[in-house]
Amino acid sequence: MLNNLEKQTREIVIDVVERSAIQPGNLFVLGLSSSEILGSRIGKQSSLEVGQIVVEVVLDELNKRGVHLAVQGCEHVNRALVVERHVAESKQLEIVNVVPNLHAGGSAQMAAFQLMSDPVEVEEVIAHAGLDIGDTAIGMHIKRVQIPLIPCQRELGGAHVTALASRPKLIGGARADYNMDIIRKS
């Protein structure tokens, strides 16, 4: 199963990033349950190896596009997120003090701490899009109005995969004109 994990993750990330219309400089949230990928219940079989594979692929694809990654932790760290320090500072995000482990923060946050150059935890973000691998509930960190994206693959290992993009609110009613919806073109 781990043999295909990198390839499948890359296909999903490319699909979601391209269809979300996310722009350079925007934030992208990753929620990940390595336990769910391995076929267990969320939080019951955390795997640093799985976290490293997924986060490395996501970071690689986002870095190519100039998009910033925010890795969501579990409820034991109040769903805080790991970002690069320069991102936290430039976006004026509230830095909090916690170092993730397998059972508080999770494998993806541990991997982000290893793979990012100057990682910090922040309390919350308002991201433009995100990927949820294993039903980790990333919606609280995606700006309104959220648009569900059905990824090209709905499962990664044993984990259910969903994604969210966002668009500006439509205001003004029947008399108003709107820009084209670039996420849902058809």
Curated annotation (Swiss-Prot):
InterPro entries: Antibiotic_NAT-like, DUF436. SUPFAM superfamilies: TTHA0583/YokD-like (SSF110710). It comes from the Bacteria. Belongs to the UPF0340 family. The lineage of its organism: Bacteria, Bacillati, Bacillota, Bacilli, Lactobacillales. This is UPF0340 protein SpyM50240. Pfam families: DUF436 (PF04260). It comes from Streptococcus pyogenes serotype M5 (strain Manfredo).
